[in-house]
Each structure stands twice: as C-alpha cells, then as structure tokens.
Amino acid sequence: MGQDTLLLQTHFGTVRDARPSDTDSIVQMVGKLAAHHGDAVTLTPEDLVRDAFGEKPWIHVLVAETDGELIGYAALCGLIQLQFGVRGLDMHHLFTEEKIRGRGIGTALVDACKTKAKALSCRYLMVGTHPDNHKAQAFYEALEFMRRDGHPPRFSLRLEN
C-alpha cells in the first residue's frame, strides 16, 4: 500500500499515507464524522487495521498531520468502469477537525487523494454528499468536481495521467 509515503508537504504540515500506529486517532475521527451526520459508529480499531493495513487492504487512508498530531483524514475505495477498463477511487470520507476547518486542510487532503489516485492509475475521483450539505457541495464544485445527475448528490473529477 505504500505506507509512510509523503504525498504532500503543506503550510500546516504533511499529508501522507496512514500507518498502523495512526489507527486509534483515525477511529476517533471516524466517530466525529459519523456523529456530525447523526450516525452510530461500530468501527473498531481491529476493523480499520484489517481494512487499511491487513494482508489484503480494502481501502486507502490518507492523514493530515501537524506537529505529530493527526488533524484530518480521507478514506478511498476502489471503483471501476470495467467496460472501459477505467479505474477510479471513491472519496468515501473526508474529514478535518472542526477547530481548524477553513484553513486549507480539506483541500490538501483532496490534492493528496488526486496524487494517490494517479499513482494507482485511476482516471477519476468520485465523492458523494448528504443532500443538505450545501457547504460540502460548494467545496467540491470549487475544486472543479462536476455534479452528476441523481440523488444523493455525487461529484466526479477527471484526472489527467
């Protein structure tokens, strides 16, 4: 999976591939994101280790870090348009700590997701939002994601390799 890969050096610190030692912090952030959406969390550290760091990883997790503290993450899942032989990634989660939102961390995580997708020979990123999350929708559109037809809102970004 390329753990310990630095994807982006930023004004706040770094965005890199998550490592097993990040598990507890990531699980806590997943809980915060779920609470924000009114969801119950059943993810355990063991689940995350299996899915992100196990023998057959199912997801890619990127983390934003400043001064040794994790302040955000993105979780990516594989997609494919098999009839075209085209790979993509779904940005399943994007989260930054509430106290530091609006400082470019989310944008840096999206940029790192693009880098990761290109490294995996993907040609697009997809992301969905809650229908009432207009702030997130505007965020993705500002980053040149294209709104797709359908409900709930979905956005895609073509990547040039």
Q: Which residue ranges define each predicted feature?
A:
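Conserved acetyl-CoA-binding loop-helix of GNAT-fold acetyltransferases
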Residues: 102-115, 138, 142
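Acetyl-CoA-dependent GNAT
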Residues: 9-13, 17-21, 25-86, 92, ...
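Acidic/polar helix N-cap motif
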Residues: 19-22, 97, 133
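A short, internal acetyl-CoA/4′-phosphopantetheine-binding micro-motif in the GNAT/acyltransferase core
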Residues: 94-101
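Short acidic N-proximal helix/loop "leader" segments that mark the beginning
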Residues: 1-8
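Conserved beta-strand-loop-alpha-helix junction that forms the acyl-donor binding cleft
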Residues: 126-136, 156-160
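Conserved GNAT acetyl-CoA-binding A-motif
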Residues: 117-128
